[in-house]
Structure formats: C-alpha cells, structure tokens
Amino acid sequence: MSVMNAHQRQQLENTHDYMEHLKREHPLRDLFWECTLRCNMSCRHCGSDCLKESRVPDMPLADFLPVLDEVAAHCDPSQVMVETVGGEPLVRPDLMDCGRAIRERGFMWGMVTNGLKLDHAVARELAQAGITSLSIDVDGMREEHNWLRNSTTSFDAAMRAIEAVQTIPDLTWDVITCVNGRNLPRLNEIKNLLIEAGVTQWRCFSIDPMGRAALDKSLLLTDEQFRDLLNFIVTTRCEGKIDISYACDGFLGAYEGLVRDYFFYCQAGLTVASVRANGDISGCLSIRSDYSQGNIYRDSFWDVWENRFEQFRDREWMRHGPCKDCEAFRYCQGDGFHLRDGNGDLMMTCHYKQLKNIKL
C-alpha cells in the first residue's frame, strides 16, 4: 500500500485547511495533568522513566485548580477533557478528590491506568467521583504483557480492571496496546482475548525511542513490522468485531483514513495542552521538556496558551533534515511533535519514510 488515491488526497487537503483554522483559533479541548510521576511498575518502554518514588513531588490539587478556573473563565468547561496521567494516577491517595474537583468545575475527567490497583471497589470510587473516560494498558497475552511491564501480576490485574470498569455507568473507555516485536505475532490472539473480555474500543501504539525505550532498540518495530501492524489494523477494522485504531502518532501516507477515523494532524498546542508535575506548561506530555512554554507557578496558564506556543502553531521551522524537501510536509507538518529532540531533529525515521523504505 504505497499510493494515495484521489479521495485520500482530498481529505488531506481538507485536514490541512482545518489545521490552519486550528492554528488561528487553538480551541483547548484536552488538558493533561501529570498529577504524579510515581508509579507502581517499572515498565521497559516507559517514556517518562517513572519510578516508585519520584524526585518531583506530586503537584498539590490546590496548585492545579487555579488553572482550571482560568480555563473555565474563557471557554465552556464541558467541552474540555482533563486527563489525570502519570506515572500511575491511582498511586495518588487523593485522586478521587481531584476527580470530584474537576467535575465540580464542569470539566470532563479522564485517566490512563496500568490497572494494577483498579478493582471493583476502586471502580465504584471512580464512578462516585464522576469519571467520564478511562484507558487501560494491555500489552499482549500474559507472557508478553508481564515481560513488557516487568511484573508477574500485571496481566491478571489488567484483565480484572477491564471487568471492573464495565460496571461504571456512562463511561467511555478503551484498551491501549504498545506493539513491539514480541507481541506483534500474537495480535490476533490479543484481539480475540479483548473481544471476549467485552472490550469494544482498542488503540494500538508503536513504541518511540523515548525514556527507557531509548535504551532498548529491540522494542522498536522494523519498517516491515510497522507495515504488518497497520495491515492488521486495516483487516480488523474491516471485520467490524472491535473498533480498532492506530494512535495519533504520525503521518502514515497511503494508510491515512484506513487505520484511524480521522486524517493525521499533531494536535499539541492546537487543541491539546499539558501541565507537568513541576508546573511546566507544554503541548502533550510526550514532548521533551525543552519545548515547555511557561510554568503555572510564575505564569498565567491562559496567557501562555493564548500568546505563546509559536513553535507549535507555525511548524515551518521543522522543514529541515529529512523534512526539507519531503513531498508530504504540507500534510504532516513535521510529523508528531514528540518525535523531535531538543535540537528540533527527528529522533527516528518518520512513519511515512518507514513505509516508503519497504521494498515492495
């Protein structure tokens, strides 16, 4: 699959026009709060290199609430999802208080969890705290999942979490799988496992060379393996038994429109902002701290959102190196911002060129 058809090209043009609109208007839709850097696992692929105890303390809820009050003063909070992420959010003892405070201000509240602490009792607490969105990590069958997570109990905990979240009323939830060379051959088994467990939404990620994953290149997919992942997603979408998609990770050329419900554009700084555990304000949390735009302890969050983020909203500066003469730059705009190192260079071959490298 190497050539885009006329319909795809028209949709890419439409997406390009929409991106230009977002650059001008930048309506905030997703606000990620790194509520802790502590974690109860030590996963091989962790992009944040999280530990059981962190040198950076959890941000007090009282420090984050003024950010929400600022946002609510300038836009409709019911249209903004506040995602509590980590680390592992459930290691934070006041997480339910955080969730209630978010909901009391009219925002939607979501969370990404490894599931280790999520049982039926915790699910009831989450429901009472008003959670609206949740993602659970399942990274393979038992052997592959436990290997990636460095834990002998994490697979059973994740499956228990899947059972528990189905008791939460009106919850939007999905399963996230980080695909690597070990679990790629078992994607069909994983698919059947998830369907049998009641999962209807499934997002697949490939692993990027960040955090601990930067030290273990075996976690990264080869060009051919990456193509196989995308082909699996296309086939599974056609089957219609589970709603599967590839993550918002990068521009995919001829696979655009086939593996996601939308055409790629990096939303960091356009509709997505983040507050790190130390107060830094950025686009998405996967982006290096070099690109932080301010800090809530010295800056107004809303002023930063409205008047900074130039690097995010005008990405012509990314048009160098392999992007300089690339025919896809108009549409990919330098690919996912998180793939840039501190010098602005790509940390890996972009997905578009990965797919082009394959000899058909």
Feature locations, PLM:
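Residues immediately within or flanking Cys/His clusters that coordinate Zn2+
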Residues: 32, 36, 40, 263, ...
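Exposed loop/turn and edge beta-strand positions of beta-sandwich/beta-sheet ligand-binding modules
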Residues: 29, 80, 269, 278, ...
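Conserved alpha-helical substructure of the radical SAM core
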Residues: 2-133
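Radical SAM enzyme [4Fe-4S]-AdoMet core and its adjacent flexible, acidic
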Residues: 1, 52-55, 59, 128-129, ...
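Residue-level preference for beta-strand/loop junctions
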Residues: 27, 37, 171, 266-267, ...
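Flexible mid-to-C-terminal extensions adjoining Fe-S/redox cofactors in radical SAM and related proteins
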Residues: 2-27, 286-360
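Structural motif corresponding to alpha-helix initiation and N-cap regions
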Residues: 61, 92, 119-120, 184-188, ...
